[in-house]
A protein has these predicted regions:
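Active-site neighborhood of phospho(di)ester-bond hydrolases with catalytic His/Asp-centered motifs
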Residues: 6-8, 29-35, 53-58, 90, ...
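Binuclear metal-dependent phosphoesterase catalytic core
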Residues: 1, 18, 94-98, 174-178, ...
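Short, structured coil segments at secondary-structure junctions
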Residues: 47-49, 85, 201-202
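N-terminal active-site segment of His-dependent metallophosphoesterases
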Residues: 1-47, 61, 136, 140-144
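Short amphipathic alpha-helical segments and helix-helix/interface helices
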Residues: 20-21, 41-45, 168-175, 195-196
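A short, gly/pro- and small-residue-rich
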Residues: 48-57, 168-171
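Active-site environment of divalent metal-dependent phosphoester hydrolases
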Residues: 11-15, 37-42, 58-65, 110-115, ...
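Conserved catalytic scaffold of divalent metal-dependent phosphoesterases
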Residues: 6-15, 56, 60-61, 68-166
Length: 223
């Protein structure tokens, strides 16, 4: 059983607090689903001393250039010497942490000329890049993946009708094909305590990590 702290989109005062160690002492892993400053992630890592995996969203992308070449500016190159904040960048990658298999996709649906935005087709291409590794996991570990970390939600699950906050159909295909236990996303801000944060879709529990959210990997319930 693992306890995972998920964060996204806003600096949560319950996390960014002198009491963070007391509140989250039993957390095994941290997932950051985008739109957060890296110094906030650095605070979480340095105080909890737990592995933290992250992706960029469509905001707070100033340091994205250190991790990848931006599609619209060939002069900005991936920086191999950048030390970062100690977190592990997961976008368009697959990682194994202990017995947990994770993958991530950053960014949002393309709605203007800003960085880290994708068309539906471009997101399918990002997924295709990971298929060989996913198939290898199925052969070696008996499953493709445990947790998919995204910024945007899947189409029709927790998303909105405006172009920026529309979810990706590609994630529905990913869940149907590779059956992760969890898909953790951000991007959709929650201002009402009654708004839905967790939805079961086929074999996957889809979770909105806005602010912060805790996952227990044994019972697939969070709070």
């Amino acid at each position: 059983m693992l306890k995972i702290l998920c964060v996204s989109d806003q600096i949560d005062p319950q996390v960014y607090s002198p009491q963070i160690k007391e509140r989250f002492a039993d957390v095994d892993l941290v997932l950051a689903a985008g739109d957060l400053p890296l110094d906030y992630l650095d605070f979480i890592i340095s105080t909890l001393n737990k592995p933290l995996f992250f992706i960029f969203g469509n905001h707070h992308t100033e340091e994205l250039r250190h991790y990848k070449r931006l599609w619209n500016d060939p002069m900005l190159q991936e920086d191999k010497n950048y030390m970062g904040c100690g977190a592990i960048y997961l976008a368009s990658k697959l990682k194994i942490e202990g017995k947990l298999i994770l993958a991530g996709f950053g960014g949002s649906m393309r709605y203007n000329t800003g960085p880290n935005q994708y068309t539906e087709f471009e997101m399918y291409l990002e997924i295709i890049k990971l298929i060989p590794s996913l198939l290898w996991n199925r052969l070696k570990h008996g499953r493709f993946i445990d947790i998919l970390l995204t910024h945007s939600p899947p189409r029709g699950i927790h998303d909105k009708t405006d172009k920026c906050h529309t979810g990706f159909k590609a994630y529905l295909w990913f869940m149907k094909t590779f059956k992760p236990k969890f898909l953790v996303h951000g991007h959709i801000h929650l201002y009402d305590l009654c708004e839905i944060r967790s939805t079961q879709w086929e074999k996957t529990t889809v979770i909105n990590a806005f602010g912060h959210y805790l996952i227990n990997t044994e019972d697939q319930n969070g709070n």
